[in-house]
């Protein structure tokens, strides 16, 4: 009994010890340890939007797509943005008088709401979490908007389709809008790699996820269009909508180029010349 009392009064530097099932005729007791227990830091409250428009009428949005992200319409059919779910186990049996201690049983599940941390090194689940997918979506969408505009503009001004632009540069030499450039193709490639690489390194050096996507300032918002929070939210929504449309549109450009070998303007003119007989169905059925 004295040993039991001494154990119960032991220092709690290494953890918290809970003593139970102590009887006067036995020195057996069950101990639970909580090593390094810390108070959980308060989490940011999420803005939950109810009755918001969804990607499909009558669709049910997943719990993790609560509308807090701009342009969130509850679309994630493959569950790619679903946060990791962890099993909670009870503590293993710690009775030294037993021949075999039993493992702790599963007592529940726990899902962590991952908040982006200001660190260049993040766990796998955070790097490929919902916030990371949004960053990739927006960056790819911006590139797609530039590519879509570039493909249409170049074909309109020069008649060269976007898929043949590289061939023309290799044969006729590097040029811009018909004007020759004093650089070879290999030199231009190195310039592009170095410039874009430097820009991407600088962007990823920003640890604040909001500033990494929307840097603002005199270089990226010289007119101060995002100074008003309400207008900023509207512009962010318009941008993500146009970005998604541009990604789908350029995918259509690629499919058209593979099927017909023509550019988007040429395909559009061909379709307008005979709308009833020049469609995507006719194109793939005749190929």
UniProtKB/Swiss-Prot annotation:
Photoregulated by reversible phosphorylation of its threonine residues. Chlorophyll a 4 binds at residue 242. Chlorophyll a 5 binds at residue 256. It comes from the Eukaryota. Chlorophyll b 1 binds at residue 55. Chlorophyll a 2 binds at residue 140. Residues 1-31 form a transit peptide. The chain crosses the membrane at residues 143-163, 181-201, 245-265. This is Chlorophyll a-b binding protein CP29.2, chloroplastic.
């Amino acid at each position: 009994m004295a040993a039991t009392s001494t154990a119960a009064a032991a220092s709690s530097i290494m953890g918290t010890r809970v003593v139970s099932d102590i009887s006067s005729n036995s020195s057996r007791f069950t101990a639970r340890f909580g090593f390094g227990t810390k108070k959980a830091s308060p989490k940011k409250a999420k803005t939950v939007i109810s009755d918001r428009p969804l990607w499909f009428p009558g669709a049910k949005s997943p719990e993790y797509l609560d509308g807090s992200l701009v342009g969130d319409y509850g679309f994630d059919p493959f569950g790619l943005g679903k946060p990791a779910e962890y099993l909670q186990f009870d503590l293993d049996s710690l009775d030294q008088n037993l021949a075999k201690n039993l493992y702790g049983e599963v007592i529940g599940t726990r899902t962590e709401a991952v908040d982006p941390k200001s660190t260049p090194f993040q766990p796998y689940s955070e790097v490929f979490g919902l916030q990371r997918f949004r960053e990739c979506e927006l960056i790819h969408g911006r590139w797609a908007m530039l590519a879509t505009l570039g493909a249409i503009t170049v074909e309109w001004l020069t008649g060269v389709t976007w898929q043949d632009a590289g061939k023309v540069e290799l044969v006729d030499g590097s040029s811009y809008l018909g004007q020759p450039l004093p650089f070879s193709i290999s030199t231009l490639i190195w310039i592009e790699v170095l410039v874009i690489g430097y820009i991407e390194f600088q962007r990823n050096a920003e640890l604040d996820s909001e500033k990494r996507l929307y840097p603002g300032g005199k270089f990226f918002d010289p007119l101060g269009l995002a100074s008003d929070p309400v207008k900023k939210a509207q512009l962010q929504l318009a941008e993500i909508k146009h970005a998604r449309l541009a990604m789908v549109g350029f995918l259509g450009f690629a499919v058209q180029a593979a099927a017909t070998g023509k550019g988007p303007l040429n395909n559009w003119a061909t379709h307008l010349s005979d709308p009833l007989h020049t469609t995507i169905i006719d194109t793939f059925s005749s190929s």
